Amino acid sequence: NQKTVGIIDKNDEENYVKIAEPLGVVAGVTPVTNPTSTVVFKSLICAKTRNPIIFGFHPGAQKCCTFAAEILRDAAIKAGAPENCIQWIEYPSIEATSALMNHSGVDVVLATGGSGMVKSAYSTGKPALGVGPGNVPCYIEKTSNLERACNDLILSKTFDNGMICASEQSVVVDENIALKFENIMLKNGCVFLSEEESEKLTSYMINPEKGTLNGVVAGKSAVEIAESSGIDVPKNTKILIVRLKGVGKDYPLSVEKLSPVLSYYTVKDSLEGFERCKEILKFNGEGHTAVIHSQDERIIEKFGEMMDAGRIIVNSPSSQGAIGDIYNCATPSLTLGCGSKGKNSTTDNVSVNNLLNIKRVFKRRVNMQWFKVPSKIYFEKGSISYLEDMDDINRIFIVTDETMVKLGNVQKVIYHLNKRNNNCQIEVFSSVSPDPDVETVWSGLEIMKRFSPDAVISLGGGSAIDVAKAMWMFYEYPDL
């Protein structure tokens, strides 16, 4: 229900207006992994923001992407969208996609793909939203709910056969719970490979010259990968797990694997676990995502501070947690920014907010006027904003009547009080009648005593002011 057209925010209290406009023509670059879902997502956020999009599909996914784009285009036109709201290059190539991104009619590039293609997007001289690779570490700390952590890991890593860039690529486990972890994973259909089997798997999965994943692996099940590697595993195998002692080029399977294959490390404690996770992120995963399973809030907070990742997923499956709005409040997205660490422009879960030009209209605000009798009295429209800056007020007692509440005037006062830096406490007494009697004063005084304010605000006419003055007097001088 987010508004993305015209006036999207009008703040009468601070006198500004925000107006949303589209960025313009979007060049959409899509990968061979998650091709159709990326097409659907980018088309939807462009439609929501009134930006036409022209796709350059990966040549290996041209047919399925075209099929998806045709369905979306036809549905959009049927709903009233312009005829050419969704377009694509019919004969794909790297050269054609590059020409699209550099075309003078394109206003912004929205790129998902290999690091080379994303780098090209940022080299066009146009605003670009590109995303980087995700070599995601998952740290399972000794205080974690281990059964749940294993379930989350399997759920995430097997989803779409591990094709999600936010899926866990390596699992790092405290050694004093490692045996229990292994037993749970074995019980749930995972297989730990021997050193010989790991070498066979490496030969099949990794290009020895480039040190990168062979394209034929992506999207295959654990059983298919094992068979292609010459490894015998049970037919119900969900994940292949490889024990590694290090990270980097000397350990080929420590790369992003985009498959139901996990590298596995054990560590002595959280300090060593953090360092291992940082190593994994630095090996072509910086800025993307890191995962921790723990019940220790201090450990979780420290992990968040130390990891160079735009998303820290806590006690959740990473694939589903990173894309947002399932296990957390993250913005739903299939385009996950990696920030400056990943050579991207944002760490956002890219969505409609990234595809809008927001114009801000700032109206003149009248300077507050005052005179001292003996303290300051502000008047003119907007004068209550001074409540944001008054010194030494922490507990505010508001005396008013029901009419002021219904008119929204009390809420205006509270609005400015809530903008203070000290998180002040507020109590409202709204039982002042047009002709208040002494009982009104006594009843309000009892509430005031319990609340112990250091400031009183009277809001309304003479009745509210008189009651407030009397209450404050008896509060300050209870012996009268």
Residue ranges and their predicted role:
Residues 1, 191-235, 291-368:
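C-terminal segments
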Residues 4-148:
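Rossmann-like NAD(P) dinucleotide-binding subdomain of oxidoreductase/dehydrogenase enzymes
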Residues 27, 170-173, 258-269, 289-292:
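Short, well-ordered beta-strand elements within core beta-sheets of diverse protein domains
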Residues 40-41, 45-47, 118-248:
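ALDH superfamily catalytic-core signature
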Residues 88-91, 264-268, 377-383:
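Short acidic-hydrophobic, aromatic-tinged amphipathic segments that line or gate anion-handling sites
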Residues 368-455:
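ATP/NTP phosphate-donor binding region
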Residues 439-480:
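Glycine/threonine-rich beta-strand-loop-alpha-helix active-site module
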